[in-house]
């Protein structure tokens, strides 16, 4: 007998005249968790009680746009024969996490400079919250029928419903990549917190090391998961952008961790 993960029972529900997608519910829950965790951590680190709310609200649109753009560019063939508005239909799913990270990071440094906030201190506070929010987003992917893998005979294989998967053998089972990534994210959160409490505070690691570790560890994790991931559509460039993005995350993480050495050899107590 095969103990599989069943298809999602629902994709959403009616709230009066409004149809609410489960994907949206989990995305909202993730955003709230990200804000709460980051705000608490940043208050402990700096005493600043206002900046987190400003940063999260200011970065919301750039992050969504970057994530959506990454998804569309990664799956151009999916939209070639679709109505143009489908490019913007984020309620149907399709946000590329890596694109959101980089668009948010670029915009964040701008607002941090304007507000005169130590950027790497905030990024350290932010890192665990990003991963926690992504766990909720991956649950939303399950309800949207996204982020699954290739066929598997493992007992925790994912069973897909017929709707939307006519090109697949729905009698088979597939790797639940969304679940693997949730486990990966929780594992990285634990590592980050241990490093923060046991290593970074006792040594000369610069501020930003927690965020740098997040980028490197998540990038490595994506490299491990991508070969198992099933892509319903490919982009028109013959290039898997998720590998490129994962490599970029690792490189940026290493540069952030080494920036003091590269620039002037400053230590942690020299500030941001």
UniProtKB/Swiss-Prot annotation:
EC numbers, comma separated: 2.5.1.145
One Pfam match: LGT
Keywords from the UniProt entry: Cell membrane, Membrane, Transferase, Transmembrane, Transmembrane helix
Transmembrane segments: 15-35, 53-73, 90-110, 117-137, 174-194, 199-219, 237-257
Top EC class of this enzyme: transferase
One GO BP annotation of this record: lipoprotein biosynthetic process
Pathway membership: Protein modification; lipoprotein biosynthesis (diacylglyceryl transfer)
Membrane disposition: Multi-pass membrane protein
The keyword Transmembrane helix belongs to this UniProt entry's keyword annotation: yes
Compartments reported by the entry: Cell membrane
UniProt: a 1,2-diacyl-sn-glycero-3-phospho-(1'-sn-glycerol) binding residues: 138
NCBIfam families linked: lgt (TIGR00544)
Protein name: Phosphatidylglycerol--prolipoprotein diacylglyceryl transferase
């Amino acid at each position: 007998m095969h103990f599989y993960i069943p298809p999602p029972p629902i994709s959403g529900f009616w709230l009066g005249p409004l149809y609410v997608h489960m994907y949206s519910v989990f995305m909202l829950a993730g955003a709230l968790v990200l804000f709460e965790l980051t705000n608490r951590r940043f208050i402990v680190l700096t005493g600043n009680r206002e900046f987190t709310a400003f940063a999260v609200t200011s970065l919301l649109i750039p992050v969504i746009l970057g994530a959506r753009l990454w998804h569309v560019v990664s799956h151009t063939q999916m939209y070639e024969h679709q109505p143009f508005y489908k490019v913007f239909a984020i309620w149907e799913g399709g946000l590329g996490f890596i694109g959101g990270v980089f668009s948010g990071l670029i915009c964040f440094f701008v607002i941090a400079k304007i507000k005169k906030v130590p950027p790497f201190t905030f990024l350290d506070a932010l890192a665990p919250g990003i991963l926690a929010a992504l766990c909720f987003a991956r649950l939303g992917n399950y309800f949207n029928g996204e982020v699954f893998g290739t066929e598997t005979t493992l007992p925790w294989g994912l069973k897909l419903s017929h709707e939307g998967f006519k090109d697949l053998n729905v009698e088979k089972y597939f790797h639940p990549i969304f679940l693997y990534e949730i486990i990966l994210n929780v594992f990285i959160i634990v590592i980050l917190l241990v490093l923060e409490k046991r290593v970074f505070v006792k040594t000369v690691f610069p501020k930003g090391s927690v965020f740098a570790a997040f980028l490197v560890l998540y990038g490595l994790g994506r490299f491990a998961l991508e070969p198992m991931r099933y892509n319903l559509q490919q982009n028109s460039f013959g290039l898997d952008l998720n590998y490129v993005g994962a490599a970029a995350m690792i490189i940026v993480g290493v540069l952030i961790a080494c920036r003091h050495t590269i620039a002037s050899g400053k230590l942690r107590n020299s500030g941001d």
